[in-house]
Amino acid sequence: MGHVDREDLLNVIRHELRLEDDDGPGLCSRLLLNPDRKCRAGGLPLDFRLKNGDLMDDGDAGFDDIYEIPLYEEPIHTRTLINDSLALRTAEKIKEEGRRDNFYTGPLDELFVKQEVNWPPKTPISTEKSAIERYLEENSANLNNPLGEYSKFAATTTDPSRQIEIIIPMSCDEEIGFKTLKIEVLTTARIREVIGYCLLQYYLTFDSYLPGEVDDYQFYLAEEDGEIEHELPPLDSSKLVGQVGFTCLGLVSRIKKNGNSRQKRAVAVWFVDKDQYVIEVDNMEKPLRWLRDEAFRLREETVKEREPLFQGLLDIKEYYMEAVDNFDVKLDLEASISSARSLEFVMIRKNSSRAGFHPRGGRYGRQMSAMLTLKMPNSPIAAGPMTPLPTVMEESPAVAGTSNGFGFPKAESCGAIASTPGVTWNDDGGQLSSFIVQRIHKFKPKWKANLIFRWTCFEIEKYREDRSAFLPQGYQKHTKVPWEYVGGVRTQLKDAKAGRVDMWQITFFWLPVLSDETVKDVIGDAEWNLNLVAKIYANEEKWRSVTLETFFKQDVDEIFSQTNSILQARDASIYKAFSHSSFGTLSPAASADLALMESAEAIVSPSSDAPSRSSNGKNGGKFRKMSSLMASVMGRRKSDSK
């Protein structure tokens, strides 16, 4: 028995019986829903019209009426159908419009416009000058002047500035004793830059150049009447103008003042890879940046000769400098070489460290740097940041021929350095070095001794065994002096005779060591200074000394270098006083007075916040008093020497 389900019945009514009901009353349309709304989206293929296109010619019958839905539809890719449809529509559109390509078939000359060109072009003759020509004529003095780079330090209306009167002494041949020049410069300019600006303004004002270069001149304190204080030290070329409160300065040529050319010094620059470059410096007032650039130049020349394969590589030049004896203290590249108080430097790459690198090995490394700045109990000075380092870099053949016997000028020996927290040692410190010498006595025979340098003192003790001695050696005196009481050392060649080996003499100068009770009663908790030295040792007529002898020049240089390095690092008041005693010819009190006068710049100079229009009358009286006092002391020195 057959069975017809509901869906089959509906399909028959929709697709078969409905065709017979079209001409009738439309009962099926009213009872059944529209099949278009019920059919599945995409149920018919896209080409169902084209497949039965041959039936189109029979009449106007619709395509939908005769399409048969297949039982199974194969998937059809629509890409080819869409492309064919688009191509057909495009072809029909082109055919309808009747478009044709517009190509030019005429001569090519008609496409261009002919124009006559006259070369070279004729320049119009004009008597008026352009703005560039007028600017070059107005500023030709600055543009062609070798000192034109210093014009940028001129005062402006927006930045803080300072007005200074410059006294320029003239030669004896001219009728005018000096010339004055008023300048106004930025407070951020350094002294060496102000000197260059003065030379530029001198040329623009008087239409003549001053002889020499910028490095040949120094600033001294002066007064408005033309008097220059030559007794006082010159201003540090690395200082800023804002740090100097004087409104009247004297521009003095150091070559004319000294009567000869500048003495060259050898400065060594080390890299961490142990490359060393020795640079001759004729002026220690040059900035450290110049020294760094010279080291880079020498390094590049060496690399080209030694490692030609690395010529094309880019070398990173971001380095900073440290003194060889001072670890972890960056130097200001704009400061002068003399302000570093060292003749050897280390180049360290930025964001890096030299660790324990030292050119002379481990015993001069970071541990020595920390130990040599310690403060002993009852020490006259606080610990300083400088670390002593043996160095003999002077090109002078005789060590004792320097200005004060310490390897650097007097003006450099009194510079103040910042103090660091002190550390206390309970023992006498370890041994740094030792030398075998002969101790000289005024009345007794000389005897063989050991000169020992320790962290806190130097000692002269009897040599362990001396079988060559004829007399009994019970008179040898053990000498031990802390570094704080040592004034200095002097080396000299003994009277040389033909056919005899050179004998060198080393003389140490010091002051009596005070007892703990004296230090506690007289000084107390106060810091040692030159005033206390002059007060405590007022009854001392001369410096105590001991003389040693040796045949070895290398040992002499090492003793001289190590002693000066240690004293320079500690920078004690007794050391400052001795540097003004002419190697012990003046008494300790007189030497301390001279040292006080030389350091008077720090006392009388006003602060940087003081107004720049302060009068020079008050300071002028102080300068005259100091000059007269120094003249009297110098006269006393001459009488004592006679």
UniProtKB/Swiss-Prot annotation:
Annotated GO biological process: mesendoderm development; TORC2 signaling
Keyword Cytoplasm: no
Superkingdom of the organism of origin: Eukaryota
Domain CRIM: from-to ranges: 189-314
Assigned GO CC terms: cytoplasm; plasma membrane; TORC2 complex
Stretch list, region Disordered: 603-642
Subunit note: Component of the target of rapamycin complex 2 (TORC2).
Protein name stated in the entry: Stress-activated map kinase-interacting protein 1 homolog
Origin organism lineage: Eukaryota, Metazoa, Ecdysozoa, Nematoda, Chromadorea
Gene name of this polypeptide: sinh-1
